[in-house]
């Protein structure tokens, strides 16, 4: 029998890159968590590519060997968690414009 999750704080900051397949899977898992628990997730968008540049590292998504593992991991985790998932064949893509759109909607159209 699985243990009951206990949260010390009812608010959790969730940092995500808007185009990340891992962020998508995590978002779906979060939706299941908030249905059953009294916990609130603060979505905090980040540009993961910018963090890679800042740390002066190559993103795994641009490594032809690592991208296969990333795809396999996403498919495995989504299947295990019963999450419908299809790998975006155009991944990785530049998320800057999508992020700007997200921030605009978040700031100006809060009623959505």
Model-derived segments and their meaning:
Residues 8-13:
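Extreme N-terminal starter segment of soluble prokaryotic enzymes
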